[in-house]
Amino acid sequence: WQQVRDLRKYLPCEAIIYGRLPLMVTENCVTRCSVGCTHGAGSVLTDRTGARFPVLCGYGCRCEIQNSKTLFLADKPEMRRCGLTYGRLRFTTETPEQCVQVLKRYQNGGNWTPEDLTRGLFYRGVE
């Protein structure tokens, strides 16, 4: 968080503070090759540990494989104190109701927390 505070002294800062982060982009549709084209509707890859990675399909059958865990920082006071100019909520697989719950949580009004979450690299820093 100190690195974000230092950076904001020189320019406005934005960070993704909620959502599934993309892990990989493929040139070929991974779902079409295995189960047939689903046009991006609910495709998921499952690894050997049972973790489920949502697959978002885009133009030209490119697929974006999302993290199995959702980045969540609403319950971290450091996120509010670090001085971000903008915080981006990245909705990908959420229902409209879940989007409302997330928004309320980030506006200090809820207690919703995702089932499987990650803090991303916010506590590791950049070397």
What feature does the model see in each segment?
Residues 1-127:
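Active-site pocket-lining/capping segments in soluble small-molecule metabolic enzymes
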